[in-house]
UniProtKB/Swiss-Prot annotation:
A motif (Switch 2) lies at residues 64-80. Phosphorylation at Thr-72 by LRRK2 prevents the association of regulatory proteins including CHM, CHML and GDP dissociation inhibitors GDI1 and GDI2. Changing Q60A: Decreased interaction with RUSC2. It catalyses: GTP + H2O = GDP + phosphate + H(+). GO terms for biological process: antigen processing and presentation; cellular response to nerve growth factor stimulus; endocytic recycling; endosomal transport; mitotic cytokinesis; neuron projection development; plasma membrane to endosome transport; protein localization. It is an enzyme of class 3 (hydrolase). The keyword GTP-binding applies. Regulated by guanine nucleotide exchange factors (GEFs) including DENND1A, DENND1B and DENND1C which promote the exchange of bound GDP for free GTP. Regulated by GTPase activating proteins (GAPs) including TBC1D10 and TBC1D13 which increase GTP hydrolysis activity. Inhibited by GDP dissociation inhibitors (GDIs) which prevent Rab-GDP dissociation. This is Ras-related protein Rab-35. Changing K58A: Loss of interaction with RUSC2. Interacts with DENND1A and DENND1B; in a nucleotide-dependent manner. Interacts with DENND1C; weak interaction which is nucleotide-independent. Interacts (GTP-bound form) with ACAP2, RUSC2, OCRL MICAL1 and MICALL1; the interaction is direct and probably recruits these effectors to membranes. Interacts with EHD1; the interaction is indirect through MICALL1 and probably recruits EHD1 to membranes. Interacts with GDI1, GDI2, CHM and CHML; phosphorylation at Thr-72 by LRRK2 disrupts these interactions.
Length: 201
């Protein structure tokens, strides 16, 4: 049976508890939003296929629990991850401060993974405490892209997921190109070595 996609990528959504990770996932995967807050126990995931530059990309998006007591569960889910979405709540300064810790955790668990920073709940200017300028400055220092989103109002959610997918797709193609180049170099070396051996005879 033929596959209905060209690429399969695993994405992970991490961040403090209550920042809206599940809401972002539900908005992107099912285009739904629920105002009631339920803590995710352990890990939940959704699947959605998107098209990027004419290629079908199947996304397996894992929503992890942000609470400290679930940290051990979370660490096992980094395996095989291609992209990580780090979420903070623009109405919670603490969740923004904790982004550094989450980025450190990514570095501890993943060798080479694409990352983006997401400031969620960006739909009530009066409650916003993490300034856009500060967030952009921090993202620049970390070398990652920033998106301010609202799962509630459906603002920038699609764009954010498309961005991380494009980053992962580009990284995959770059890695393939490097591998092919390395193989060509190895073939050239082998050919040169065999010619040298013939001359020695």
């Amino acid at each position: 049976m033929a596959r209905d996609y060209d690429h399969l990528f695993k994405l992970l959504i991490i961040g403090d508890s209550g920042v809206g990770k599940s809401s972002l996932l539900l908005r992107f995967a099912d285009n739904t939003f629920s105002g009631s807050y339920i803590t995710t126990i352990g890990v939940d995931f959704k699947i959605r296929t998107v098209e990027i530059n004419g290629e079908k990309v199947k996304l397996q998006i894992w929503d992890t629990a942000g609470q400290e007591r679930f940290r051990t569960i979370t660490s096992t889910y980094y395996r095989g991850t291609h992209g990580v979405i780090v979420v903070y709540d623009v109405t919670s300064a603490e969740s923004f401060v904790n982004v550094k810790r989450w980025l450190h955790e990514i570095n501890q668990n993943c060798d080479d993974v694409c990352r983006i920073l997401v400031g969620n709940k960006n739909d009530d200017p009066e409650r916003k405490v993490v300034e856009t300028e500060d967030a952009y400055k921090f993202a620049g220092q970390m070398g990652i892209q920033l998106f301010e989103t609202s799962a509630k109002e459906n603002v920038n959610v699609e764009e954010m997921f498309n961005c991380i997918t494009e980053l992962v797709l580009r990284a995959k193609k770059d890695n393939l190109a490097k591998q092919q180049q390395q193989q060509q170099n190895d073939v050239v070396k082998l050919t040169k070595n065999s010619k040298r051996k013939k001359r020695c005879c």
